[in-house]
Amino acid sequence: MLIVISPAKNLDYDTPMPKVKTTKAAMLEDSAELIEGLKQLAPQDVSKLMHISDKLGTLNYDRFQSWSLTFTKANARPAVLAFNGDVYVGLDAYSFTDEDFAFAQDHLRILSGLYGALRPLDLMQPYRLEMGTKFANNRGKDLYAFWGSKITDALNKQLKKVGSETVVNLASNEYFKSVKPKALNGEIITPVFKEWKDGKYKIISFFAKKARGLMSAYIIKNKLTQVEQLKSFDWDGYTFNKAMSDGSELVFTRKQ
């Protein structure tokens, strides 16, 4: 199985890191091309493009200006240890063993507006560039046009390497839109997490994001390789809901 997840807006470059062997991202030439265009923007342009405050616009302007193809311990850290949103709280990569990191390196990909598709231990300089950003570039009107089939091609290459025909989609819709399902050499399985509220089960964003991270960790820590094994997921009170599921969508529910 190959798991795909979204990145996070919040970053952590301060927490002491475990000793891990880092790797180099595969699509850095593409990243550099994007950065070249982003460096032309003024701080206020960054704010407008990303719909963020002037303070955050200046922060990300500075990040773009300082970005380079030289990745060091001083300016970068492994992606899975740099992102710090709800998904990554659930994933809790700081608790990974060496075996967990090794499995994740082969079976987990983080979709990224700037880096395309990252392995967990790929070094990453801090940035913010959401996949849905309408940043016009040499390849088209937005980042979906920029990445084209490259992310899908990278996933297909990894599916072949690990001998799998299953992609576990734990990414948001915004990010999974960068993948071309018809060109993907594998079945897409999408776990969905719902909470009991006001007399029915519904998706609550905060809990769903954390649960995507939990499911990713569950697969990694248990070294799962078969879709059927996902149905045993029972962390944080979730259980597989057969009645609400269909072939490709696995629904997990809980009553708090």
UniProtKB/Swiss-Prot annotation:
TM region positions: none
Gene Ontology biological process terms from the UniProt entry: response to hydroperoxide
InterPro entries per the UniProt record, alphabetical: YaaA (IPR005583)
GO CC field: cytosol
Domain of life, source organism: Bacteria
Pfam family, one: H2O2_YaaD
Family affiliation: Belongs to the UPF0246 family.
NCBIfam families: PRK02101.1-1 (NF002541), PRK02101.1-3 (NF002542)
UniProt name for this protein: UPF0246 protein Sde_3824
Species lineage: Bacteria, Pseudomonadati, Pseudomonadota, Gammaproteobacteria, Cellvibrionales
